[in-house]
């Protein structure tokens, strides 16, 4: 006698490559999209106002797009002798590039020494460096200015650059990265006769591209946006950076809003391009250094 088997309930096969969106996922996408739009609004206003006239900016009538765009604002910006925009861009580029390259080199050396070269007071030195992170940077401006002034570096390019070459947090990032670096590669280098400098140059440094790109991006943005220190050191318009030049528009008796927004657009455009091109290195570098939320 045959035994009857109950029918097996079958579910329709879901097409490959299609996933069912959960309500929580949809809500997350909506919230993130709204936040993205919120953060993009200031950039939209900057670039929109840069191509409008003064009456159009001050008008109560809202203008979504600058039609027609007024590119003469760009000419007015660079022809203003009281606000040397070309000089500010040149000085900002020089300061940001030199500080970025120099800070990466110095911080990588310091991090390598703290992670790989043993000596008696290494931990004491490391924790003393970490304590300096608790001191606000603005507190050090007065003694730092006195030091820079005593050696004659006021109104000089080196006065703008050298104090920003040393960064405790950057050295900390490199130290954490080198602590997690496999020792097998260094042992192989020692077998080949490499000393500490050789290990750093030929093994560790070439494998530090991720952390170098992340730190370089952060350093470049910070140097480019620096305002207070260039304002203190650059007492002559010959040494003004782009942020100091933009501040002169706000201290004038009549504010040229189109020129101000055009200058802000020019100042922010390199940062937007660099950040979009290299944003993935921030995550890779911070993750490689062992700092996770």
What does each model-found stretch correspond to?
Residues 25-293:
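A structural signal for multi-pass alpha-helical bundles of membrane permease subunits
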Residues 1-21:
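Short, Lys/Arg-rich, polar N-terminal cytosolic tail immediately upstream
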């Amino acid at each position: 006698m045959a035994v009857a088997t109950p029918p097996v309930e079958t579910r329709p096969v879901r097409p490959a490559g299609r996933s069912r969106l959960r309500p929580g996922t949809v809500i997350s996408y909506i919230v993130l999209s709204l936040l993205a739009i919120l953060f993009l609004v200031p950039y939209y206003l900057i670039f929109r106002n840069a191509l409008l006239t003064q009456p159009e900016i001050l008008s109560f009538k809202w203008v979504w797009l600058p039609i027609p765009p007024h590119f003469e604002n760009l000419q007015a910006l660079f022809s203003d002798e009281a606000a040397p925009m070309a000089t500010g861009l040149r000085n900002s580029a020089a300061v940001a590039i030199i500080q970025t390259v120099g800070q990466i080199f110095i911080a990588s050396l310091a991090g390598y020494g703290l992670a790989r070269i043993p000596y008696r007071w290494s931990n004491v030195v490391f924790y003393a460096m970490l304590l300096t992170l608790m001191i606000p940077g603005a507190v050090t401006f007065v003694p730092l200015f006195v030091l820079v002034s005593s050696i004659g570096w006021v109104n000089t390019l080196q006065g703008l650059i050298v104090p920003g070459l040393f960064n405790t947090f950057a050295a900390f990032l490199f130290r954490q990265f080198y602590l997690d670096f496999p020792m097998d590669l260094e042992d192989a280098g020692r077998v080949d006769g490499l000393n500490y400098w050789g290990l750093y140059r030929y093994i560790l440094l070439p494998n530090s591209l991720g952390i170098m790109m992340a730190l370089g991006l952060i350093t470049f943005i910070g140097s480019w946006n620096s305002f207070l220190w260039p304002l203190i050191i650059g007492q002559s318009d010959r040494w003004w950076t782009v942020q100091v030049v933009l501040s002169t528009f706000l201290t004038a008796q009549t504010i040229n809003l189109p020129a101000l927004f055009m200058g802000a657009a020019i100042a922010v455009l390199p940062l937007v391009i660099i950040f979009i091109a290299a944003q993935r290195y921030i995550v890779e570098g911070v993750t490689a250094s062992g700092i996770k939320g």
